[in-house]
Amino acid sequence: MSLKVGKAVPDFSLVADNGKPYKLSNKIKNKVLLVFYPGDGTPVCTNQFADFRNNEEKFKKLDVEIIGISSNDSKYHQSFKKEHNIPFTLLTDEKGQVASDYNCLGMFGIKRGIFLVDNKMQLKYSHIESVSIFRRNSDEIIDLIKKYS
């Protein structure tokens, strides 16, 4: 599936870190930054979410909710969130179907990617890292949100 800026993104329902279903179309109120990432507890992913956590207020001022998506189960997400004081919802894409729909499924699992989605489920911006050890930092993402919102 090819995602295009200005077009609708695929809706999905996944299990959240609290063990409950999370359906994008039912939860989206303002803007959402979908963050696909390889896995909880890995060095780059931990640094990425710590960076988001440390800049949480900047994202809130822009009415952006951050949602993380990896293949880890909800119990692992809970542990990761607690250990690193991560305030964002983390979703489980165990089989990689949603990652595949968003072109973030690679040979070795979920690839790192970000997708800015507005409250009408329209894609405003997307970026998939070619190598998962790279990531956009919060300042870069905040500038992109301002530019594309």
What is each residue range found by the language model?
Residues 1-149:
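Chalcogenol-based redox active-site neighborhoods
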